[in-house]
From Swiss-Prot:
It comes from Symbiobacterium thermophilum (strain DSM 24528 / JCM 14929 / IAM 14863 / T). This is Ribosomal RNA large subunit methyltransferase H. GO terms for molecular function: rRNA (pseudouridine-N3-)-methyltransferase activity. The keyword Transferase applies. S-adenosyl-L-methionine binds at L78, G110, L129, G130, R131, M132, T133, F134. GO terms for cellular component: cytoplasm. It holds the Pfam family SPOUT_MTase.
Length: 161
């Protein structure tokens, strides 16, 4: 299985970078996982709704360019309006994708303003991490941990309780 996290902006905090690297290492036996980062767009202080929409559009264009243009990836966007999966449901989702030969996944993480409608339209699946709001730089770590947990569940290995 090949999994790409396509995300806006670099993870800047060292403790988050360390966590991301730890889960990338833990995932090596299970899947080929990589993180593709596109630059975030500066948000002017006191930005108007039109300026915020323009920021999301520019970031969205970058995200869309980073996705596989050949349609070989199943695109999963993270959005608060998406489907809430339990850890077991995420495990079943990954197993189902692998079973049906759809084993190339791109998880798309937007910037601090969210995702442009054009990116949402590209989604094969829309996933929510829950109703809470997370600092968008934390999302790669949270998502990688959940993907790791899902592989452990699918293999019946000790980790998930």
């Amino acid at each position: 299985m090949r999994i790409r996290l396509v995300t806006v902006g670099k993870v800047k905090e060292k403790y988050l970078q360390d966590g991301v690297q730890e889960y990338l290492k833990r995932l090596r036996p299970y899947a080929r996982v990589e993180i593709v980062t596109v630059p975030d767009e500066p948000i002017p202080d006191g930005a108007s709704p039109a300026q915020e929409a323009q920021v999301m559009q520019r970031e969205g264009e970058r995200l869309l360019r980073a996705l596989d243009q050949g349609g070989q990836e199943h695109v999963v966007v993270l959005d608060g309006r998406g489907k809430n999966f339990s850890s077991e449901e995420l495990a079943a989702f990954l197993a189902e994708r692998a079973l049906h030969g759809d084993a190339n996944l791109a998880f798309v993480i937007g910037g601090s303003l969210g995702l442009d409608p054009a990116v949402l339209a590209r989604a094969g699946t829309t996933l929510s991490l829950g109703r809470m709001t997370f600092l968008h730089q934390m999302v790669p770590l949270i998502l990688l941990e959940q993907i790791y947990r899902a592989f452990k569940i699918n293999r019946g290995e000790k980790y998930h309780k």
